[in-house]
Amino acid sequence: MSAERLVNPHSDSDDQQVEKSLRPRTLSEFIGQEKVVEQLRIAIAAARGRNEALDHTLFYGPPGLGKTSLANVVANEMGAKIKITSGPAIERAGDLAAILTNLQPNDVLFIDEVHRLNRAVEEVLYPAMEDFALDLVVGKGPGARSLRLNLPRFTVIGATTRLALLTSPLRDRFVAVHRLVFYSDAAMTEIVSRSARILGVPISPEGAREIGRRARGTPRIANRILRRVRDYAQVVANGEITLAVAREALAQLEIDELGLDENDRRLLRAIIELFNGGPVGLNTLAAALAEEVDAIEDVYEPFLLQLGFLQRTPRGRVATRRAYEHLGLPFPERSLPLEDESGPQQGTLF
């Protein structure tokens, strides 16, 4: 999958630089995810009222929905410092120990991709989260002894796109677990308008709405598209993003009315044209598209499932009637129920 794909919800280096300037600082500035925000507001107010660290918190959901932003907001609301790291970055137990021993009372430790922590690191994290203690082994061989080092009370905020990959012991140590969902069109419009204001881009309400509704319910994608449409407006128009300018730019970027790009349409056409609409196994589909299995599961499928264009069945992926209609293809009337169909092209599910 190309790193330049606009509707890829995963972050890249350019996104990270811009996102810092666009990131909300308080819960009142955070747009969308109303249930999560309200629960956090109550939890933060209670923790501050008791002068305690916030309970360990886990955010999960598709990428680009604001898990890192919420972690920063929580730290700001708590008046605490935040240390940001990720599961793959903590390779050894000693790496985690070094981070933990530098935390101050009520600090926030944000671990992105927390499901990718290795087992040795998790073993160190368990007592740190539960007892606010660090168990160290001093020495080697018969003379080795265990030493427990007390830690200040702090908050671990974990973020993951793959909740099922978290081990049960780690998941159980998060007191609060919040699921982030795709944003509504109204919230996306508000996010685009806010980002344009911060970036100094003139935009009409209709232009903001057009970008927002094609951004797949994902703020990161909306902000990325906004920057590209801004460039188009600057060069082709008078610099203002109107409805007409937004539509012209999005057409040039090959992002359709529902936010699908050519890669999404290629996946749907592959299922329909190469595998008779499915079912087709994930590995088979990945091979046909020359894509990674993880890319299909993490990047393509969540939004296609949300739209109802794709179904996951025990025997593989299936394109729905909606997918056929969106691509302008006739939907075949099946003589047998889907679960009874067979064919040499179905592949394997895993």
UniProtKB/Swiss-Prot annotation:
Region spans: Head domain (RuvB-H): 257-350
Molecular function (Gene Ontology), one example: ATP hydrolysis activity
One cellular component term from this protein's GO annotations in UniProt: cytoplasm
Localization terms from the record: Cytoplasm
Keyword terms: ATP-binding, Cytoplasm, DNA damage, DNA recombination, DNA repair, DNA-binding, Hydrolase, Nucleotide-binding
EC number, as in UniProt: 3.6.4.-
Binding site for ATP: 22-23, 64, 67-69, 130-132, 173, 183, 220
InterPro entries: AAA+_ATPase, AAA_lid_4, DNA_helicase_Holl-junc_RuvB, P-loop_NTPase, RuvB-like_N, RuvB_C, WH-like_DNA-bd_sf, WH_DNA-bd_sf
Claim: ATP-binding is one of the keywords in the record: yes
Record region (Large ATPase domain (RuvB-L)): 1-183
Catalysis: reaction(s): ATP + H2O = ADP + phosphate + H(+)
Region of interest called Small ATPAse domain (RuvB-S), as start-end residue ranges on this chain: 184-254
Oligomeric and partner information: Homohexamer. Forms an RuvA(8)-RuvB(12)-Holliday junction (HJ) complex. HJ DNA is sandwiched between 2 RuvA tetramers; dsDNA enters through RuvA and exits via RuvB. An RuvB hexamer assembles on each DNA strand where it exits the tetramer. Each RuvB hexamer is contacted by two RuvA subunits (via domain III) on 2 adjacent RuvB subunits; this complex drives branch migration. In the full resolvosome a probable DNA-RuvA(4)-RuvB(12)-RuvC(2) complex forms which resolves the HJ.
Job description of the protein: The RuvA-RuvB-RuvC complex processes Holliday junction (HJ) DNA during genetic recombination and DNA repair, while the RuvA-RuvB complex plays an important role in the rescue of blocked DNA replication forks via replication fork reversal (RFR). RuvA specifically binds to HJ cruciform DNA, conferring on it an open structure. The RuvB hexamer acts as an ATP-dependent pump, pulling dsDNA into and through the RuvAB complex. RuvB forms 2 homohexamers on either side of HJ DNA bound by 1 or 2 RuvA tetramers; 4 subunits per hexamer contact DNA at a time.
Record remark: domains: Has 3 domains, the large (RuvB-L) and small ATPase (RuvB-S) domains and the C-terminal head (RuvB-H) domain. The head domain binds DNA, while the ATPase domains jointly bind ATP, ADP or are empty depending on the state of the subunit in the translocation cycle. During a single DNA translocation step the structure of each domain remains the same, but their relative positions change.
Family statement drawn from the similarity comment of this UniProt entry: Belongs to the RuvB family.
Protein name in the entry: Holliday junction branch migration complex subunit RuvB
Top-level taxonomy: Bacteria, Bacillati, Chloroflexota, Chloroflexia, Chloroflexales
Gene: ruvB
